UniProtKB/Swiss-Prot annotation:
Tree of life domain: Eukaryota
SUPFAM superfamilies per UniProt: Cysteine proteinases
Any one Gene Ontology BP term: innate immune response
Species of the source: Caenorhabditis elegans
GO molecular function: cysteine-type endopeptidase activity
Paired cysteines (S-S): C105-C134, C117-C162, C153-C210, C154-C158, C190-C214, C198-C202
GO CC aspect terms: extracellular space; lysosome
Record propeptide residues: 17-91
Pfam annotation, one family: Peptidase_C1
Protein name, per record: Cathepsin B-like cysteine proteinase 3
EC number: 3.4.22.-
Residues annotated as the enzyme's active site: C120, H284, N304
UniProt-annotated glycosylation sites, renumbered to this chain: N138
Highest classification ranks of the organism: Eukaryota, Metazoa, Ecdysozoa, Nematoda, Chromadorea
Length: 370
């Protein structure tokens, strides 16, 4: 009888433990399939789908969670654009997609792949830079900015390479030191990404060393001449203001946002994500390209850097207006310094676009004064 009593206590304890695990305290070694089934059972805002990538491999796609927090020295720095008063308040649309407003800017549509390096902070920066150069130049300049250059050469000012980094510092690096061109692994440009996409038995990637030469097949420019510079880098909002973030995107293009990642996010397939269950895994940085409403839920439209097999062909939606996973608390952007001499850039498809002296000058004047 005593054995039966202790067995009952043991089973009750196990049941309580499993329930606590599923509720989000910590799913520990429980199968990820259990988590996916739980997510799909308790809510209908988004759909989770079990994937075959192990937790061990997936953890390398995020960074140290501290990099998702704003730098303390920037906590009271308002957006330079709002301080200058360049944005005139106006009604914003209920839905917006930067791909539709600037259809000639191919990089806005591009989904890149960071592989097993926590370089999301550098990806987000490179993507925003690429998009904004195109937007400011009215589509005549379309560089695919190198993640590798930012990742390997920004150093400890930005963070710890594949372990994570600060998005704002990546943009400041672009403004002070410039960034060359370069697509994903095996791509075009001066300095493409070192790491190939991987989906099974993937080793952890280590931060590549900083190089100051272009790949041998790139004959267009030397490293220093291939540099693209920013005119400014700034925080978009210090108050988690949804309207300020929307206004920035609507007028100037995509922005970079850092946020906290939980286990359930790895299994996102579609819908409007919000944290449901699972432990905190780390931080992540992504590119916000728009917003909208789905089934009555406000969302941000976001480009991830985990390849096109993730989510909605590489994109995802996350709840807007509630600072979900702190995504509205650390949003940054920058303004490009367009060249005023004849420049030719290689995009990731190898197509070149050019800008004449007169055309570039007119574009700069139009962008800032019209």
């Amino acid at each position: 009888m005593l054995k039966v009593y202790f067995l009952a206590l043991f089973l009750a304890g196990c049941s309580a433990f499993v329930l606590d695990e599923i509720r989000g305290i910590n799913i520990g070694q429980s199968p990820q399939k259990v988590l996916v089934d739980h997510v799909n059972t308790v809510q209908t805002s988004w759909v989770a789908e079990h994937n075959e990538i192990s937790e061990f491999e997936m953890k390398f796609k995020v960074m140290d969670v501290k990099f998702a927090e704003p730098l303390e020295k920037d906590s009271d720095v308002a957006s330079e654009l709002f301080v200058r008063g360049e944005i005139v308040p106006e009604p914003l649309p209920d839905t917006f997609d930067a791909r539709e407003k600037w259809p000639d800017c191919n990089t806005i549509k591009l989904i890149r792949n960071q592989a097993t390096c926590g370089s999301c902070w550098a990806f987000g920066a490179a993507e925003v830079i690429s998009d904004r150069v195109c937007i400011q130049s009215n589509g005549t300049q379309q560089p695919v900015i190198s993640v590798e250059d930012i990742l390997s050469c920004c150093g400890t000012t930005c963070g710890y390479g594949c372990k994570g980094g600060y998005s704002i510092e990546a943009l400041r690096f672009w403004a002070s030191s410039g960034a060359v061109t370069g697509g994903d692994y095996g791509g075009h440009g001066c300095m493409p990404y070192s790491f190939a996409p991987c989906t099974k038995n993937c080793p952890e990637s280590t931060t590549p060393s900083c190089k100051t030469t272009c790949q041998s097949s790139y004959k267009t420019e030397e490293y220093k001449k291939d540099k693209h510079y920013g005119a400014s880098a700034y925080k978009v909002t210090t108050t988690k203001s949804v309207t300020e973030i929307q206004t920035e995107i609507y007028h100037y293009g995509p922005v970079e946002a850092s946020y906290k990642v939980y286990e359930d996010f790895y299994h996102y397939k579609s819908g409007v994500y919000h944290y449901t269950s699972g432990k905190l895994v780390g931080g992540h940085a992504v590119k916000i390209i728009g917003w909208g409403v789905e089934n009555g839920v406000d969302y941000w439209l976001i480009a991830n850097s985990w390849g096109t097999s993730f989510g909605e062909k590489g994109f995802f939606k996350i709840r807007r207006g509630t600072n979900e996973c702190q995504i509205e608390g650390n949003v940054v952007a920058g303004i490009a310094k367009l060249g005023t001499h004849s420049e030719t850039y290689e995009d990731d498809g190898g197509a070149a676009t050019s800008c004449s002296f007169i055309m570039c000058t007119l574009m700069v004047l139009t962008y800032y004064f019209v």
